[in-house]
Amino acid sequence: MLGTLGLWALLPAAVQAPPNRRTCVFFEAPGVRGSTKTLGELLDAGPGPPRVIRCLYSRCCFGIWNLTRDQAQVEMQGCRDSDEPGCESLSCDPSPRARASSGSTLFTCSCGADFCNANYSHLPPLGGPGTPGPQGPQAAPGESPWMALALLGLVLLLLLLLGGIVVALLQRKAYRVQSGPEPEPDSGRDCSEELPELPQLCFSQVIREGGHAAVWAGQLQGELVAIKVFPRRAVAQFRAERALYELPGLQHNHVVRFIAAGQGGPGPLPSGPLLVLELHPKGSLCQYLSQHTSDWGSSLRMALSLAQGLAFLHEERWQDGQYKPGIAHRDLSSQNVLIREDGSCAIGDLGLALVLPGFAQPRAWAPPQPRGPAAIMEAGTQRYMAPELLDKSLDLQDWGTALRRADVYSLALLLWEILSRCPDLRPDGRPPPFQLAYEAELGSAPTTCELWALAVEERRRPDIPSSWCCFATDPGGLRELLEDCWDADPEARLTAECVQQRLVALVHPQEAQPCPEGRPHSHPEDWPPAPAPAPALLPGSPQPGACHFGVQQGLCSRNPGAACASSDV
């Protein structure tokens, strides 16, 4: 029988865990998929494996071994993403999980002490009692009576628990009869107490219904407004979105304007918390593109305004004595972008938006932080999710930058949808009917697995027709812009600020490429105006000319071979 792996001898005694931080052995065999290195901070414990990792999200180590008839081979060691059952053990006691292949079995353990995953106490012989066989785990001789007694005890415990619940319910009912009706839960009552009534608010019709809220069209003091009504069970979602809209400095032409928060309800419906927002009668970008085509100037106006709105959200700034943090939208889709009266875009629905870590926030600034990797990687519409969100490989060490990159990927899909309805980019002037991104490849309701296979495994993107080069300042300008935004490598993507600069360059081209089909270009008066210069960015933020998210960032040039002046992040 194999002994311990003896990995303790390879760990330097100088590696000590700080208080409240678990330190584990880290190892991943070649070919293992799904790295866990982002769940902790890797430390240099020696010239070769195993290494040491300091856990960020749990106080639990794990180990996985592959037992064959000849030997036990380490497959993975590291930190778990949460404290699971079994993590209270101070030693690694592996248990069989599955048959990796014929003649081998995977064993895993969880433990809650520093370096506890370096050694295992014992492994049963392959094919012995407790090792999974073709029909699953086999019970050892003599286990059946003990198992029956354990089940009997569990049944008795459940019966006692049910009896206690029944008695408690009867006592509560008797108390209600004596003391009158019970008040509503605290969460709903507190929310109602702090929200004003809006007696002049009128509801007209439902625009959209979702999982956490319904959006109505209505009026407030004679102004047409959109009213987002939350049920009482969604008070937490209401508070999170309200807190974002009420951030100082969050006013921009291309972000939906927040008007008020209050309580109420349409007609006889029960009142609940609500947000009053600016109404855009032309509807969402998806609805608009389904019913209209847009010439070159109008398409650029939509694309540029969308990039300006996202760049504003991502930007961290001080202006007029007010601090605005960077914000990741995390649910950028053509349903959540609205069309203004002038044909430009306004980004809405901040229900999943997240305040990002900053470089120069005030000392008293303490925004709520996401709790663990799952909260950081939460995203909205699957169709627009970046590859690193689909395969759960988002960079958790610098999650603020990583979420900005994921937004830029979604932005690229929206730009493709806008340009796909531009007749000036078609030889015959007839764009096809509107389709969402990946709808041609996967249909109207793709599954997560289908999106993963297409966007992650095959690295495919929506088709870019060759005729789109006609209106770029250099051949392939539009193609290069989209490809630089939806690159499979997040670090290679443009920033939203750089997307804005490239679109400005397309609005005012120096030389227009002749279109082979002879279609005329749009007139200059149809082009959208250049954006006003943005206020100075904070020290340490990406500079206005910085294109990519990498450490070395170059100026915004459409020539990939041109020399780029680097700037510090």
Curated annotation (Swiss-Prot):
<dbReference type="GO" id="GO:0030509">
    <property type="term" value="P:BMP signaling pathway"/>
</dbReference>
<feature type="binding site">
    <location>
        <begin position="207"/>
        <end position="215"/>
    </location>
    <ligand>
        <name>ATP</name>
    </ligand>
</feature>
<comment type="subunit">
    <text>Interacts with type I receptor ACVR1.</text>
</comment>
<keyword id="KW-0460">Magnesium</keyword>
<feature type="binding site">
    <location>
        <position position="228"/>
    </location>
    <ligand>
        <name>ATP</name>
    </ligand>
</feature>
<keyword id="KW-0547">Nucleotide-binding</keyword>
<protein>
    <recommendedName>
        <fullName>Anti-Muellerian hormone type-2 receptor</fullName>
        <ecNumber>2.7.11.30</ecNumber>
    </recommendedName>
</protein>
<feature type="topological domain" description="Extracellular">
    <location>
        <begin position="18"/>
        <end position="148"/>
    </location>
</feature>
<keyword id="KW-0479">Metal-binding</keyword>
<keyword id="KW-0464">Manganese</keyword>
<comment type="similarity">
    <text>Belongs to the protein kinase superfamily. TKL Ser/Thr protein kinase family. TGFB receptor subfamily.</text>
</comment>
<dbReference type="GO" id="GO:0046872">
    <property type="term" value="F:metal ion binding"/>
</dbReference>
<keyword id="KW-0808">Transferase</keyword>
<keyword id="KW-0675">Receptor</keyword>
<keyword id="KW-0325">Glycoprotein</keyword>
<dbReference type="GO" id="GO:0005524">
    <property type="term" value="F:ATP binding"/>
</dbReference>
<keyword id="KW-0472">Membrane</keyword>
<keyword id="KW-0723">Serine/threonine-protein kinase</keyword>
<keyword id="KW-0067">ATP-binding</keyword>
<keyword id="KW-0732">Signal</keyword>
<keyword id="KW-1133">Transmembrane helix</keyword>
<dbReference type="InterPro" id="IPR000719">
    <property type="entry name" value="Prot_kinase_dom"/>
</dbReference>
<dbReference type="InterPro" id="IPR045860">
    <property type="entry name" value="Snake_toxin-like_sf"/>
</dbReference>
<dbReference type="InterPro" id="IPR011009">
    <property type="entry name" value="Kinase-like_dom_sf"/>
</dbReference>
<keyword id="KW-1015">Disulfide bond</keyword>
<dbReference type="GO" id="GO:0005024">
    <property type="term" value="F:transforming growth factor beta receptor activity"/>
</dbReference>
<feature type="signal peptide">
    <location>
        <begin position="1"/>
        <end position="17"/>
    </location>
</feature>
<feature type="region of interest" description="Disordered">
    <location>
        <begin position="512"/>
        <end position="535"/>
    </location>
</feature>
<dbReference type="InterPro" id="IPR000333">
    <property type="entry name" value="TGFB_receptor"/>
</dbReference>
<dbReference type="GO" id="GO:0043235">
    <property type="term" value="C:receptor complex"/>
</dbReference>
<feature type="glycosylation site" description="N-linked (GlcNAc...) asparagine">
    <location>
        <position position="119"/>
    </location>
</feature>
<keyword id="KW-0812">Transmembrane</keyword>
<feature type="active site" description="Proton acceptor">
    <location>
        <position position="331"/>
    </location>
</feature>
<comment type="function">
    <text>On ligand binding, forms a receptor complex consisting of two type II and two type I transmembrane serine/threonine kinases. Type II receptors phosphorylate and activate type I receptors which autophosphorylate, then bind and activate SMAD transcriptional regulators. Receptor for anti-Muellerian hormone.</text>
</comment>
<feature type="glycosylation site" description="N-linked (GlcNAc...) asparagine">
    <location>
        <position position="66"/>
    </location>
</feature>
<dbReference type="GO" id="GO:0005886">
    <property type="term" value="C:plasma membrane"/>
</dbReference>
<feature type="domain" description="Protein kinase">
    <location>
        <begin position="201"/>
        <end position="511"/>
    </location>
</feature>
<feature type="topological domain" description="Cytoplasmic">
    <location>
        <begin position="170"/>
        <end position="569"/>
    </location>
</feature>
<feature type="disulfide bond">
    <location>
        <begin position="92"/>
        <end position="109"/>
    </location>
</feature>
<feature type="disulfide bond">
    <location>
        <begin position="55"/>
        <end position="79"/>
    </location>
</feature>
<feature type="transmembrane region" description="Helical">
    <location>
        <begin position="149"/>
        <end position="169"/>
    </location>
</feature>
<dbReference type="Pfam" id="PF00069">
    <property type="entry name" value="Pkinase"/>
</dbReference>
